[in-house]
Amino acid sequence: MNPTTVFRLPLLFVLAYALILSGSLILVSYPDVSVRYPELSLAAYLSKVFAFQLIQLTGLFTLTSLFFYHYRITQLNRKTVLAVIGLTLFLYTANMILGSLKAEWLSHLMAKMIAEKAEFADVILLVKTTDIGLYLISFVLLGIATRLVAKYYLKVSHPAVIPDGKAPDIYALLFSCGMVYLMWMIALFLTAVITPYLPGGIPAPLSDNAYTTAAGLLISCGIIFIVVRQKFPVAGGILQIRPLVISVLLSTVLSILVMAAITAGTVYMVLLTSSFRHFGVTELWMMTAVSIALTLWISRAVTGVMFRR
């Protein structure tokens, strides 16, 4: 019998995507870039590009895990491996086409904005918003392609929302992690919109927040993993999606607000006490630990309240 897997096929998808991307960067992109910037090494170029791609790769793992489990692509065999590789090639091609359209559209629009003497913050906001929009479009395309592959190539039968009863908490975990990822993307978009209206605020490009966003995503998914495994109930074998959706949304929104409050309070205290010269890595780790603890408490409390109703 073919072994059932939940995370091996999504991991294969991400590794295949990273391998294709690396080959394209090394064989196609870097030779062109090195002509213009001879001082840029291959390692520095790859690290810079993968910093930009880190958000998408972490999101790909959680969302492909959800897609594959949802459409019952869980059997590890030759057909599923070929299907995963085909989906990887499809997504890479779609992203390349979207990237080309983005570059052409942005160059035309930015030239127009510069001619109209638009603010630099508006240009950065436009770039950041476009990046987030392309991420979401690529994920929608991946979901549609996964459904078509499961239906017409693998011909799997799938009770879409009701698991087979063996591990319903896995579906809840994947569903929640996918939602948290999308919430992080929405939070980035809102940050980009709000920042220009703050005193001296200029939104940073999306790549500047790559490591922070990926770390926040992993921490949030880890917290949800702990909460879901301990508290996720099944009533009559049917997955309770509605309270799960509400609890994840509330937990994520409240956690983002708490982290924003902690950051604002810390900045205010540092400026008020004139201790910014002594503020370093230790204090940042303390802020992170407090944010994680409060996020864990909020998630447990909200999940408990929603499922007791």
Language-model segments: residues:
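Short, Lys/Arg-enriched, Gly/Pro-containing loop segments at transmembrane-helix junctions
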Residues: 160, 308-309
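Non-catalytic accessory regions used for complex assembly or targeting
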Residues: 1-2
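Membrane-interface helix-boundary motifs at transmembrane edges
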Residues: 71-81, 158-166, 233-242
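Alpha-helical transmembrane segments and immediately adjacent membrane-interfacial amphipathic helices
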Residues: 5-32, 48-70, 83-109, 127-155, ...
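Short, flexible helix-coil linker/hinge segments at the edges of structured domains or between repeats
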Residues: 107-120, 157-160
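Juxtamembrane membrane-water interface segments that cap and precede transmembrane helices
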Residues: 37-44, 116-124, 199-205
